[in-house]
Amino acid sequence: MVKQHSYNRDELLLSGHGRLFGPGNPQLPSPNMLMFDRITRINEDGGQYGKGEVVAELDVHPELWFFRCHFAGDPVMPGCLGLDALWQMVGFYLGWIGGHGAGRALGCGEVKFTGQILPDNRLVTYNVALKRVINRRLVMGIADGSVAVDGETIYEATDLKVGLFQNTGELNGA
């Protein structure tokens, strides 16, 4: 597979069906849980740590599913969905560099919310800077991330961890 440095919505949807990195390899969630419309930049040597970065965007419009249920009369994008987008991006990165297995979020350090995403906003920009990538028997990415809406940073998360697993049953003690 030739590495691209950006991906459109249709290409991301292929990932959700296991057709971008191949069967048994990392895949993004399908809609509605896919939390971005495109990846505008992905590389192995960018970001603040020089170990890789991913930048993705979500177009905001009032019809997005979460505005109908969170909250009635006070619509706001749940902060956990922005955090999940950052984990999705770390998992995508691990597949992009050739990691094998199913991706799972493993945790994070600190999370700080200083703003919100509302139906009248226009654009969410997610940024992930890889701090460490382990690509041996264990495949794991550790990154810092941020979420901006209409150019203003509103969430920050440190030490986002995603691992790739050959047998996800191991996570439940099976």
Curated annotation (Swiss-Prot):
Keyword entries, A-Z: Cytoplasm, Fatty acid biosynthesis, Fatty acid metabolism, Isomerase, Lipid biosynthesis, Lipid metabolism, Lyase
Active site, per annotation: 70
Pathways per UniProt: Lipid metabolism; fatty acid biosynthesis
GO cellular component: cytoplasm
Single Gene Ontology MF annotation: trans-2-decenoyl-acyl-carrier-protein isomerase activity
Subcellular location: Cytoplasm
Catalysed reaction, written as an equation: a (3R)-hydroxyacyl-[ACP] = a (2E)-enoyl-[ACP] + H2O; (3R)-hydroxydecanoyl-[ACP] = (2E)-decenoyl-[ACP] + H2O; (2E)-decenoyl-[ACP] = (3Z)-decenoyl-[ACP]
Keyword Isomerase tagged: yes
EC numbers for this chain: 4.2.1.59, 5.3.3.14
Pfam families: FabA
Superkingdom per UniProt: Bacteria
Gene Ontology biological process terms, A to Z: unsaturated fatty acid biosynthetic process
Keyword Lyase among UniProt keywords: yes
InterPro entries in UniProt: FabA, FabA_FabZ, HotDog_dom_sf
Assembly description: Homodimer.
General function of this protein: Necessary for the introduction of cis unsaturation into fatty acids. Catalyzes the dehydration of (3R)-3-hydroxydecanoyl-ACP to E-(2)-decenoyl-ACP and then its isomerization to Z-(3)-decenoyl-ACP. Can catalyze the dehydratase reaction for beta-hydroxyacyl-ACPs with saturated chain lengths up to 16:0, being most active on intermediate chain length.
Family membership noted in the UniProt record: Belongs to the thioester dehydratase family. FabA subfamily.
The name this protein goes by in its record: 3-hydroxydecanoyl-[acyl-carrier-protein] dehydratase
